[in-house]
Structure formats: structure tokens, C-alpha cells
Design a protein with these regions (language model features):
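Conserved alpha/beta-domain cores
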Residues: 2-361
């Protein structure tokens, strides 16, 4: 935790800055670290990280190989208590601050084994044949998973996953409220490229959330928003902003989609680009202002033209980088979100950006 003179100094920085600094955290432990460092909420919780625990992954795999909706729902019911507990941990640590929960994003094949012995063990545990499981794994493989069956596309194909996650968020919030915790759940739908994708899922989430609140006789303000990580979403932000309560620019994927190369593969040629002065900076570390930044500017202007009060922020790696934070400040975004240990850096960078902006007026 930050203490003593440094705490006083950081409080001066907070008095100056305009941007809120939130954190990317997937569990209560990381959330506590971030709060100790001065984070004012969670800007990104990646729910898929919660599924990789040994007991949970088995039930999630059971859901993946299920043939019917009822079988999938039965498997998801076993995961629901874990998800609920995880969300309760986050709400407790962030008492009074927003917690942005991104629904399932990665393609399903990432949750299945690829080694022969692991496939055989899983087939035995699931009570299916090895050939059946192999066929299932093969059917989920993709040529380009980054642009494949993931994010909101997964949720639209399997709405029962969205229903389970919505229940987990709502029930966790209700239980925390009974303990006197001030809860601010923000549900985030990933990889939206068309407003109709967002509307389809919002029309599942909102009625279910509202019915659970009514059932428990609880009143709670929650938000439903999306990540802007596909160029088309940025270019049609006015359409999406009519439906969404907030946008979070997922600058990692937005950079990949805009440049047309993946972060995982770019290392094969980026060093050559630096040597030959084609690129001066890593676009995955420092936001590309001229390209990706221009899309963010367009999206911000379009969104605010139809929804002036929409909450806008970024939650990629760039959320903890100084020049990227200055860009967000100058554009008038509401917040940046970064990893817990970068929170103090982001707070200082946000203060510096605000001071520089005032000096230039």
C-alpha cells in the first residue's frame, strides 16, 4: 500500500487529474492490490480467467461438449456458484466503485486439451469416447481464432452462457448489498461490431437482471456497455451509443484489427521495423495516435453526439502508458484502466496530462 509522504504526494496528483484510474483485475487479490494503489474501480474483469481452476474447467468442458441446450444449462448451473463468489469478492474489494465485468471472450477451443493423454483422460472423465471428443475439438478449431467465433458471437450462439453470467453478476450484487456493500455492476459485451449484436444480447441481459432484482425486492443501478475493439464499431459508434451505457476501448484488439497483424505474430517482424525506422514505437505499448487514436476520436465524437453522458474509457495495455494517457485526457475520456501495479504510474501520468493541458490553454 502507498503511505507516508508518497501518499500525500499522490493525493495532490489526484486533486489535479481529470481521468479516473481504474484497474484490470480478475480476482479479489488483484483488486485489493489495485485499491491499495489508489484505483477507483475495475475497468476490466476477464471472466474467462475464472474458468481455468481445475474443478471449474471440468464443468465448463462438460458444457462445451454438450449436445443440447438443457445439457449446457445443467453444466453452467454447476459453474454459477463459483462465478457468483468471484464477483462478490470483486464487489467487496471495490465497495462504492464501478466493477466492469466483461462476459466470455475467447473461443471455446482454448478451454479444451490438445495433448493425446489429456484428451484420453478428459474423455474418460466426461464419459464420452476419445473419437467423439477429438471430433468436437476439431470442429472448434479455427484458421484465425482472433477474428473467429469469440466474444459476442459466442454469446449469440450460446445465449445460455450469457444467462448464467448475468445471474452470477446480479445474485452476487444482491448478496453484497445485503451486507451493506455499495455495488456498481457494469456488464461489458465484447467484440461488438454491429449494433444489432449488442441489442440482441442486451435484450437477454436486461430483462433477466431486472426480473432477479424484482424477485429479491432489490433496487440497483447497473449498466450494460461494450468494448470497442473492431474498427466498424468505432465507425458506427453513434448507432451503438444509442443502446449502450458505456464504451471501453479495448486498445489491444483495436490495434490488432486496425493494423491487420496479431500481437502474437508481430514479434517476427516488428524488431526489423524498429531497426529500419519503419516503426519508432511498439503500437501495442504506446497507442498509435494517427491510426488507432483517430478511430477512438471518431467513436468518441459519434457516441457523444447521440448520448452526451456516455461513459468512455480504455482498458488495453495502453491504459498505463504515459503518452496514451495524455491522449485520453486531451480527448476528454472519463477513465483509463491498467494492471494493478501500473495504477500509481497512471495516476501520475493523468495528473501530468491535466497540468500540460491547462498550461496550453
Amino acid at each position: 500500500a502507498i503511505g507516508g509522504d508518497f501518499k500525500t504526494f499522490m493525493s495532490w496528483a489526484d486533486d489535479v487529474k481529470k481521468l479516473e484510474v481504474r484497474t484490470n483485475a480478475d480476482n479479489g487479490r488483484d483488486a485489493r492490490v489495485a485499491r491499495d494503489f489508489g484505483a477507483c474501480g475495475i475497468g476490466l474483469c476477464r471472466t474467462e480467467h475464472m474458468f481455468f481452476d481445475e474443478e471449474r474447467i471440468f464443468n465448463f468442458r462438460k458444457m462445451i461438449v454438450a449436445d443440447t441446450v438443457s445439457e449446457r444449462e445443467a453444466a453452467l448451473e454447476l459453474i454459477l456458484p463459483y462465478q457468483k463468489q468471484d464477483f462478490m469478492d470483486l464487489f467487496r474489494e471495490m465497495d462504492g466503485y464501478p466493477v466492469t465485468i466483461r462476459f466470455l471472450d475467447p473461443p471455446l477451443h482454448e478451454f479444451l486439451p490438445n495433448k493425446e493423454d489429456e484428451i484420453a483422460t478428459l474423455a474418460n472423465d466426461l464419459g464420452v469416447s476419445i473419437s467423439f471428443l477429438k471430433n468436437k475439438i476439431d470442429s472448434l478449431k479455427e484458421f484465425n481464432p482472433m477474428m473467429g467465433h469469440r466474444g459476442c458471437r459466442l454469446s449469440i450462439t450460446y445465449p445460455e452462457i450469457v444467462a448464467m453470467q448475468t445471474k452470477a453478476v446480479c445474485l452476487a450484487a444482491i448478496e453484497c448489498m445485503k451486507d451493506g456493500i455499495s455495488v456498481k455492476p457494469h456488464i461489458m459485451i465484447p467484440l461488438v461490431g454491429d449494433v444489432n449484436e449488442f441489442k440482441y444480447l442486451k435484450d437477454i441481459i436486461a430483462p433477466l437482471f431486472d426480473s432477479l432484482l424484482l424477485e429479491h425486492n432489490v433496487s440497483l443501478d447497473y449498466k450494460i456497455g461494450t468494448m470497442i475493439e473492431i474498427p466498424r464499431a468505432a465507425l458506427t459508434a453513434d448507432e451503438i451509443a444509442k443502446e449502450a451505457d458505456f464504451f471501453s476501448f479495448g486498445t489491444n484488439d483495436l490495434t490488432q484489427m486496425t493494423y491487420g497483424f496479431s500481437r502474437d505474430d508481430a514479434s517476427k517482424f516488428l524488431n526489423c521495423y524498429y531497426d529500419k525506422k519503419i516503426f519508432l514505437n511498439d503500437p501495442f505499448v504506446r497507442l498509435d495516435i494517427n491510426g488507432v487514436g483517430e478511430l477512438i476520436k471518431i467513436a468518441t465524437a459519434k457516441a457523444r453526439s447521440v448520448n452526451p453522458k456516455i461513459d468512455l474509457g480504455i482498458c488495453g495495455e495502453h491504459g498505463g502508458e504515459e503518452t496514451s494517457i495524455k491522449f485520453c485526457n486531451d480527448l476528454g475520456l472519463n477513465y483509463v484502466s491498467c494492471s494493478p501495479y501500473r495504477v500509481p504510474i497512471a495516476r501520475l501520468a493523468a495528473a501530468k496530462a491535466a497540468i500540460m493541458e491547462n498550461d496550453n490553454k
